[in-house]
């Protein structure tokens, strides 16, 4: 009985030991497989993240353009419009910087082959930055003209309009000044000047980012012009037509 009991006690211990040994050997293999799968998915996830950033930046550029068109509209409150422009402009600059950082990290070597999607994102980001700086310049011009109009309407030497409101309990009239305050006009002009300076600062930052984007662009994109990048009229076809045209002129002149 004692030997049988000892055998019953020893067998589960051996089986448990063998089970633990098998499980320890299987865990590193599972970790290696999981690590290889994650490493394979990381570039694709980064590419999708860059694509989302460029698309969001494109949306911000479109929203900013719509606000620039509304500058000077009498039906739009100018302070609230300028506040919304500042908000979208700041958010757009942050998105552009973030998109450039992510795109530069996955572009790879300059002289090697790059993914076509990366080339498309580079071109799209470059076009968005060019349009963004152009719209900033437009907003500066429109805000400058708006500031000039406000200075022209500043009531510094204008006549003061006074209403006489007699009070029922007194015969002395109450003077009520209904003219606009020069301080308010000066405050508005100062706010517009501040918005112009902030827009100019952001425009310089985006121009520097555009120059940096062109410098860090992969070599296959640097060696091509805009027409070849957008698959427009091929250069050899245009050159061949010019040769035929010149030959025809020489034939007529002779």
From Swiss-Prot:
S-palmitoyl cysteine: lipidated positions: 249-250
Subcellular location(s) of the protein: Nucleus; Cytoplasm; Cell membrane
Membrane topology summary: Lipid-anchor
Signal peptide from the UniProt entry: none
Region annotation (Disordered) ranges: 1-38
GO biological process: G protein-coupled receptor signaling pathway; negative regulation of signal transduction
Alphabetical UniProt keywords: Cell membrane, Cytoplasm, Lipoprotein, Membrane, Nucleus, Palmitate, Signal transduction inhibitor
The record's account of how the chain is modified after translation: Palmitoylated. Undergoes rapid palmitoylation turnover. Palmitoylation regulates the cell membrane and nuclear shuttling and the regulation of GPCR signaling. Upon depalmitoylation, it is targeted from the plasma membrane into the nucleus. GPCR signaling inhibits depalmitoylation and promotes localization to the plasma membrane.
A GO cellular component annotation in the UniProt record: neuron projection
Compositional bias annotation for Basic and acidic residues: 27-36
InterPro entries noted in UniProt: RGS7BP/RGS9BP
Disulfide bond entries: none
Assembly: Interacts with 'R7' family proteins RGS6, RGS7, RGS9 and RGS11. Component of some R7-Gbeta5 complex composed of some R7 protein (RGS6, RGS7, RGS9 or RGS11), Gbeta5 (GNB5) and RGS7BP.
Family: Belongs to the RGS7BP/RGS9BP family.
Described purpose of this protein according to its UniProt entry: Regulator of G protein-coupled receptor (GPCR) signaling. Regulatory subunit of the R7-Gbeta5 complexes that acts by controlling the subcellular location of the R7-Gbeta5 complexes. When palmitoylated, it targets the R7-Gbeta5 complexes to the plasma membrane, leading to inhibit G protein alpha subunits. When it is unpalmitoylated, the R7-Gbeta5 complexes undergo a nuclear/cytoplasmic shuttling. May also act by controlling the proteolytic stability of R7 proteins, probably by protecting them from degradation.
The protein's name: Regulator of G-protein signaling 7-binding protein
